[in-house]
Amino acid sequence: MSDTPQSPAQDSLAEHDEARPMRTVKSFVMRAGRMTEGQQRGLDLGWPKFGLELSDEVQDFDAIFGRQAPRTFEIGFGMGHSTLEMAAAAPDIDFIGVEVHKPGVGALLNGLLTQGLGNVRVYSCDALEVLRHCVADASLDRLLLFFPDPWHKKRHHKRRIVQPEFAELVRRKLKVGGVLHMATDWEPYAEHMLDVMSAAPGYRNQAEDGRFVPRPQERPVTKFERRGERLGHGVWDLKFERVD
C-alpha cells in the first residue's frame, strides 16, 4: 500500500464509493492509475465546483446548473475529450458525465477549469446507480454511451451494459422524443446492441434501414476511432428514440 496521503477530493470520492452496496454484476472494472499533475489539479480544484455525490434522492438539476436547458447524460466519458468538445460546441446544453476511472475524472475536471466551461457536472461512480436514484423519470433529452467495454469473451457477455434491463431504465429516464445514442467499434457488440434495443418496447430505431445510422456530426471522433479507420476498422452508431 502507498503511504501517500489522499487529497480532500479523493477522500470525498472514496466515501461514496465505499458507502454504496455493490451490484452483483458490474459492466466495468475499476483500474488503478497514476494521476498527472493536471488530473490532480482537476480533482482538487474542479471537484468542489463540478463534482456531484451519489444520492438516494432525485436531484434538481435545474437548480444545480442554475437554469433550465436540454440535458444530456453520458455514461463512461473516459478521459473526457469528447465531453469537453461537445460541451464547448453546445453551451446551451447541460451535460451530466459519469466515469469511474479517477484519472479520467481528473482530466475532465481540469479541462473544464482550463476552458472555463460551466455546463458540465460530473459523477464518479456507477452510472446505473446515478440513473436509478438521482435522475428524474422523463427528464433527459439524450443519453450517450460511446465505446463501452464490449466484453469480448462469451462468458463475460453478462457484463455488457446493454441488456434489456438497461434499455428499460434508459427509456424511463428519457423524455418522449429523447434519444439513446450508442457507438461501438466491435461489430459483434453492435449486433448485440441492435438485437437488445430492437426488442425493447417503447423505442423507435432512427436508422432508415432499421439497423445503424451514419456517424452523427455531433459525436466527436476519438483518437482510437481515427487509428481504427487507418487500420480499416469500422464504427457502428445506433440511435433509438423513446416513443412511449
Swiss-Prot record:
Enzyme group, top EC level?
transferase
The record's annotation in InterPro entries points to: SAM-dependent_MTases_sf, tRNA_(Gua-N-7)_MeTrfase_Trmb, tRNA_methyltr_TrmB_bact
Give the EC number. 2.1.1.33
The segment annotated Disordered runs over: 1-20
Q: Where is the active site?
A: D149
Q: Which UniProt keywords apply?
A: Methyltransferase, S-adenosyl-L-methionine, Transferase, tRNA processing
Example of a GO biological process term: tRNA methylation
Q: Which reaction does it catalyse?
A: guanosine(46) in tRNA + S-adenosyl-L-methionine = N(7)-methylguanosine(46) in tRNA + S-adenosyl-L-homocysteine
Q: Where does substrate bind?
A: K153, D185, T222, K223, F224, E225
Question: In which residues is S-adenosyl-L-methionine bound?
Answer: E74, E99, D126, D149
Reading the lineage from the top rank, the first entry is: Bacteria
User: GO CC terms for this protein?
Assistant: tRNA methyltransferase complex
| Polar residues composition bias: residue spans | 1-10
The record ties this protein, via CDD domains, to: AdoMet_MTases (cd02440)
What is this protein's record name? tRNA (guanine-N(7)-)-methyltransferase
